A protein has these predicted regions:
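Amphipathic alpha-helical polymerization modules
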Residues: 1-236
Length: 236
């Protein structure tokens, strides 16, 4: 949208500057929203913070210039000693099957088993193996500590009669593009805290709050100029 530089003789108005201030305030608010999500995600198991990315064409495409990258650095591992709690010590994701048949990636490894021996998330989504199939234990043990999950993700259940482990496949660990992650990165009895540092998020948010205040002040000045120009036109 274009604005005239001069509404009437002797009265100048920068319409482009007004539009820029509006876009800048919207951008600041959207970026602060990303930092807000990170702050909310601080206490979420396996949450990965987001970094705001601003396009070099922000001046021309407004709020559409904002996107984000996911920070895939590994968070701190916390011991729980729960045999069904798993964490990944390297970059990668567990695969879970949603009720609609789609596959979702997560680093939240708080799992459980149902009566059928299926390994599930806390939301009852099925955990997938390295072959892409749901992991099902050959039988449900009386004690959870009879379930063994190795560093390589191999799942086994101790059979007292056979005096050995009965295999139930491997935990599927994949990269963001879905390719298998090789390595010994599965930690049984641990969960991963988020990789959010609150001090960093609050500091970044404070910077954009200052930017928002500056852009709002500029908007007020330009808006007052517009009001003055319109009033002057009424007297012509």
């Amino acid at each position: 949208m274009s604005y005239p530089d001069k509404l009437v003789a002797g009265i100048n108005f920068d319409g482009h500057g007004l539009a820029q201030s509006i876009n800048a305030m919207q951008m600041d608010m959207n970026i602060m929203g990303i930092f807000g999500e990170n702050i909310i995600g601080f206490d979420k198991v396996g949450y990965q913070r987001k970094d705001a990315v601003i396009s070099s064409f922000a001046e021309y495409i407004g709020s559409n210039a904002l996107s984000y990258n996911v920070d895939n650095q590994v968070g701190r591992l916390l011991m729980t000693e729960n045999p069904l709690d798993l964490a990944l010590s390297e970059k990668g994701y567990f695969q879970i099957l949603n009720s609609n048949g789609t596959i979702e990636l997560t680093r939240d490894g708080r799992f459980k088993i149902n009566k059928a021996g299926e390994l599930l998330t806390l939301d009852n989504q099925k955990v997938l193996s390295s072959t892409g199939n749901p992991i099902i234990l050959p039988f449900v043990p009386k004690e959870l500590n009879h379930i063994s999950i190795g560093l390589d993700g191999k799942v086994g259940v101790f059979d007292a009669e056979k005096r050995g482990l009965v295999s139930a496949g491997y935990i599927g660990v994949v990269s963001e593009d879905g390719s298998q992650v090789q390595g010994n990165c599965v930690r049984q009895g641990y969960i991963e805290s988020s990789n959010v540092t609150l001090e960093r998020e609050y500091a970044e948010m404070a910077n954009y709050q200052k930017s928002f205040s500056a852009n709002r002040q500029m908007f007020k000045i330009q808006n007052n100029n517009l009001s003055t120009a319109i009033s002057s036109l009424g007297r012509v």
